[in-house]
Amino acid sequence: MMRRSLFQRNDLHYKNKEVMITYNAEGIAMPKIKKRLTSKWIKAVAASHGRKVGEVGYLFVNDDKILEVNREYLGHDYYTDIITFDYDEDDVINGDLVISLDTVRTNAEQFGKSYDDELHRVIIHGILHLCGINDKGPGEREIMEANEDRALELLATLRSE
């Protein structure tokens, strides 16, 4: 049984028979990402973890909106770069990912990364969560970061093709 998305989706998506990845923005300008390339990358990363992509929705927001979502749905009173809502079914990943572009920009500056690199790191971070990789327990953060690094290397390869 398919679930209904937490967020209303527009027509910005990459779709084929098995995959639907949507990209929307609320209260902030849509980031300049190559949607087809990003969707191909997401599908490849999921496949490398033995998963298929079903319905994945990205919602890009500002800090005020992510704080609202964090409070309303998770009971947390703090800003974050991404919140992942997991609706996985067996080996198919399904979920909504809410990304604060304000926090992405702040983190890029803090960590000395480009905005584009940090945005793609956060985009794939949510997919890795949907693939079952956690980052809260002992040693898990290092595993997550290693997976992010491998995924970003794959993105660089796909961009050069």
Label each region the model flagged.
Residues 1-120, 131-161:
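An acidic/histidine-cluster motif and surrounding catalytic segment
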Residues 128:
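Conserved ATP-binding N-box helix of the HATPase_c
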